[in-house]
């Protein structure tokens, strides 16, 4: 998956001369936590987070009156509080690479640029949660089961055959390294809602033939 299919393209931006007061207002108006700073050609030259605005704002214990505060906030510019030369990602980068960057760098979002370095979007940790929801198919409800397998070629075929025998419709499948050992994999399967008696028979067969870690029936209507 490439981030160009998941990023937010309607990006709120600032220029180096935008006042901190305006940046703060934009964050509140659009309910966002970061604003890229761009030059006249739309290259990303910085980024401002809500933390940057908070750190640069006067303390609540200040003795300044309202007019003095307004003047101060109007005089501080984006260039004064932005993080210059921020990390950016290309619109063709994979979702997985971007998620790794966000995790390893401890940041909440990244500007997305095209091959010419021009800002075309932004991808945030919130977007990554939306991607997980869509890719996992959790909105469809049904059940999720986790099964551990010894890593190898064709090890999932017997399980797929069993699902087919019970007319189980597979919505999504994810895999991950297992805590059971370096040669083990955990497979997470989401299955469309089934008639309860057939579902119970499938559960019993999976338990009998495979190392089933869990089986969860989810009601997304309660969310």
Residue ranges and their predicted role:
Residues 1-10, 50-87, 94, 99-103, ...:
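Tandem CBS (Bateman) regulatory domains
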Residues 40, 115, 175-178, 218:
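Short, ordered loop/turn segments at secondary-structure junctions
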Residues 1-53, 57-59:
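Basic, Lys/Arg-rich alpha-helical nucleic-acid-recognition elements, primarily the DNA-binding modules
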Residues 27, 35-52, 102, 110-126, ...:
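A glycine-centered beta-loop-beta connector
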Residues 181-187:
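A short, glycine/Asx- and small/polar-enriched loop/turn
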Residues 14, 89-90:
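Short acidic-hydrophobic, aromatic-tinged amphipathic segments that line or gate anion-handling sites
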Residues 33, 108, 169:
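Short acidic/polar active-site loop segments enriched in Thr and Asp
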Residues 171-173, 203-223:
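Conserved short beta-strand edge segments in small beta-sheet-based binding/regulatory domains
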């Amino acid at each position: 998956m490439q981030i160009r299919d998941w990023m937010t393209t309607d990006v709120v931006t600032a220029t180096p001369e935008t006042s901190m007061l305006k940046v703060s207002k934009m964050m509140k108006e659009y309910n966002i936590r970061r604003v890229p700073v761009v030059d006249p050609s739309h290259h990303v030259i910085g980024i401002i987070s809500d933390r940057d605005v908070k750190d640069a704002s006067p303390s609540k214990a200040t003795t300044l009156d309202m007019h003095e505060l307004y003047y101060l906030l109007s005089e501080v510019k984006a260039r004064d509080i932005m993080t210059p030369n921020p990390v950016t990602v290309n619109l063709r980068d994979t979702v997985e690479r971007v998620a790794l960057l966000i995790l390893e760098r401890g940041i909440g979002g990244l500007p997305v640029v095209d091959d010419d370095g021009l800002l075309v979007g932004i991808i945030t940790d919130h977007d990554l949660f939306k991607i997980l929801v869509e890719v996992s198919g959790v909105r469809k409800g049904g059940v999720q089961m986790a099964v551990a397998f010894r890593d190898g070629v064709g090890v999932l075929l017997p399980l797929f055959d069993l699902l087919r025998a019970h007319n189980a419709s597979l919505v999504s499948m994810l895999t991950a390294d297992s805590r059971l050992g370096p040669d083990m994999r955990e497979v997470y399967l989401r299955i469309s809602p089934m008639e309860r008696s057939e579902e119970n028979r499938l559960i019993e067969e999976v338990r009998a033939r495979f190392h089933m870690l869990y089986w969860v029936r989810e009601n997304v209507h309660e969310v």
